[in-house]
Amino acid sequence: MKMNSGRFLSILSLISLISFSCANQTSTADGDRKNNSSDSIIISEQNVSYSADGITFNGFLAFDSSKTGKRPTILIVHEWWGLTDYTKNRARQLAKLGYVAMAVDMYGNGKIAADPKEAQDLATPFYKDPQLCKTRLDAALSKIKEFAFTDPDKIAAIGYCYGGFVVLNAAKLGADLKGVVSFHGDLSGVAPDKKLLKAKILVCHGGADQFVGPQVVDKFKHQMDSIGADYTFKVYPNATHAFTNPAATELGKKFNMPIAYNAEADKNSWNDMMDFFKKIF
């Protein structure tokens, strides 16, 4: 089903409530630095501030401080609700696997939308001007490279829903990344340019996603194929939009929307991401 951008944003305003609910379920107090130990792994957490265009951004860094030396690094872009604990928990997961992980603040000043209308207002500028995706992600990229344990030649980015749109468009516009992964992300935006696209791409898409329909998927694939892009498009049967989010089922019922958590698709897409990282790093 093909939808115009206004309808897509309106639908996402309800989906964004998933992020809010999930954040409440997984909320933890995190100060400037915190250590979580498990066996020989010591996960250190740190709030990270950086700036661009006169705006201060408040990211979240997680890494295994028991390790030494440089290591592959992953930037994580939040849903359009803002940088909630859901995204931070994904950073923690990656840190436990040995990566440096930084959850990115795309809106600035750690802003989290108070309601769907505010979320739409915050996200709309990126949909209207995808170049903003690259500008903001580049600011985070510059910051993460300042850390001694970051391998500047092994950096990738992943994103969820709105975040998938961000990382895909940043890559298409030439972001200096080894690879990007989109989880149930919007596939619209700028057409890829062979001269600009450096990153390998993995798209994790729900086979039953009614918000990113076949026409959008076909257009994306055609554009990628037309420039010989190095991309992989994974489809998870019966998985709806927001399939990686544990809160999706409850909110789908509440708002009569075709969204649901799919544990199998969540697990399989995560494993596909890990295989992708092994390939690009």
State where each predicted segment sits.
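Bacterial signal peptide processing site
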Residues: A23-Q25
